[in-house]
Amino acid sequence: MTIPATILDTARTQVLEQGIGLNQQQLMEVLTLPEEQIPDLMELAHQVRLKWCGEEIEVEGIISLKTGGCPEDCHFCSQSGLFESPVRSVWLDIPNLVEAAKQTAKTGATEFCIVAAVKGPDERLMTQLEEAVLAIHSEVEIEVAASIGTLNKEQVDRLAAAGVHRYNHNLETARSYFPEVVTTHTWEERRETLRLVAEAGMEVCSGGILGMGETLEQRAEFAVQLAELDPHEVPMNFLDPRPGTPFADRELMDSRDALRSIGAFRLAMPHTMLRFAGGRELTLGDKGSEQALLGGINAMIVGNYLTTLGRPMEDDLDMMDRLQLPIKVLNKVI
């Protein structure tokens, strides 16, 4: 009697051997795997990551150039000016950005991402970001990424010319669930910005937040929609409910579902950098974070996030050392 192939058997052939991501229906099977098969999923996802992405972990620091006062209503975000949130509008000057980049580089990070809480940049923000990128590159050996909202073609071209090597604009969630998360702009607007970024030659970075109330079907849909972007990087956040936001009372995502999701995203995007981002400390804790780093994740944000505290950088660096995970460096000195 022939034993029917499981989804993990299929993934070994399709993803590990051939480098072809799973489709939406296949991802649903991964997301509903029984708990006792999660270790097998993590092991397979790790093998896929090693084969198609290599063994190095990329480390990134982020900083907010403009915090708070955003006119959009993203229901998870405490930086919206529409909610009763404790976050207030603050701008950083260029010397502070350069110093933050220097401190980030000292951790071994190869990327420094400058973020602003806006729908899209005005001329003041564009000019300040261009000047900041040039100033950082003149003093720090680190790549600079940016995330300043929706862009038009002229703005995309200016950022590329200034030396921004990667642009982040998260799709946030599945297209079918997006109206439950944001009402002041559309999923398609975000997608169009990413198209322009790719055309300009910058690397595309787009992910989202899991555990916002989406169904498993929508989580699988989201993974496939991200894969269609052919992104260089996908940040994986897990909802950390923020006081004063519409999602303040949402429950934390179950750690087992988070691990299944990480495995599923790796099997959907075998060649893509999957970056640990916000909420992992609460959702997964130390043990779950270690499982994920040996289960498909190959990049991390270290230090604090935009409006929430992360783990101390030293703790994350110690964890990677304990797991014997090499950190990517910009230049290898022989």
UniProtKB/Swiss-Prot annotation:
UniProtKB keywords: 2Fe-2S, 4Fe-4S, Biotin biosynthesis, Iron, Iron-sulfur, Metal-binding, S-adenosyl-L-methionine, Transferase
Radical SAM core domain sequence ranges: 55-280
GO terms for biological process, alphabetical: biotin biosynthetic process
Enzyme class at the top of the EC tree: transferase
InterPro entries in alphabetical order: Aldolase_TIM, BATS_dom, Biotin_synth/BioAB, Biotin_synthase, Elp3/MiaA/NifB-like_rSAM, rSAM
EC number of the protein: 2.8.1.6
Xref: Pfam families: BATS, Radical_SAM
Co-factor remark: Binds 1 [4Fe-4S] cluster. The cluster is coordinated with 3 cysteines and an exchangeable S-adenosyl-L-methionine.
Binding site for [2Fe-2S] cluster: C113, C205, R275
Reaction catalysed by this enzyme: (4R,5S)-dethiobiotin + (sulfur carrier)-SH + 2 reduced [2Fe-2S]-[ferredoxin] + 2 S-adenosyl-L-methionine = (sulfur carrier)-H + biotin + 2 5'-deoxyadenosine + 2 L-methionine + 2 oxidized [2Fe-2S]-[ferredoxin]
A GO molecular-function descriptor: 4 iron, 4 sulfur cluster binding
Bilayer-spanning residue ranges: none
The protein's annotated pathway: Cofactor biosynthesis; biotin biosynthesis; biotin from 7,8-diaminononanoate: step 2/2
Cofactor: [4Fe-4S] cluster; [2Fe-2S] cluster
Binding site for [4Fe-4S] cluster: C70, C74, C77
Quaternary structure and partners: Homodimer.
Classification via HAMAP family: BioB
NCBIfam families: bioB (TIGR00433)
Family to which the UniProt record says this protein belongs: Belongs to the radical SAM superfamily. Biotin synthase family.
Function in brief: Catalyzes the conversion of dethiobiotin (DTB) to biotin by the insertion of a sulfur atom into dethiobiotin via a radical-based mechanism.
Protein name listed in UniProt: Biotin synthase
Name of encoding gene: bioB
